[in-house]
């Protein structure tokens, strides 16, 4: 639940995000009928409690009566901040920066395996590096969310974010129990399998094992 951005494009990216939020929801998102609300009062209070006013660069306003919280960007976030300690499930985007791809990769892999990873880059080598060497449940390159919008691709996590996948055929396979059965004929039962285990039996077995 965070944005990890190259420090060289940090300012430009935040400017574009702010512009796009205003384009989609207007100057006052809380008054926009198309802008959703938090599911209940308890969750609203939890999400609002994750907002550090000193780090808000966009949004930050909440309206308890309608259970709405503005799209909120927190900049200058550190790994120790409260917003980085749990899944957010709300309209808050913590922003952190990196100076090298090694630093970015280490930052992600040093934390619990994410359910999803979204890689934004025009460089195919960068795309492949993070797809192949960073563990995560699933994701997209230069897009978000769409990997779970199709029944032809499994959706699921790894480690702390869950095990197994579902959607489409993956759901059937994940939630089905496959029984392993050996069905042996009764007309033959090789005595070789049973005691006493003479030395010649050991030699015979080793011939096939090695």
Q: Which residues are covered by each model-predicted region?
A:
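Glycine/small-residue-rich pyrophosphate-binding loop that anchors the diphosphate of NDP-sugar donors
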Residues: 1
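Conserved C-terminal structural/oligomerization subdomain of aldehyde/semialdehyde dehydrogenase
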Residues: 68-210
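NAD(P)-dependent aldehyde/semialdehyde dehydrogenase
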Residues: 7-113
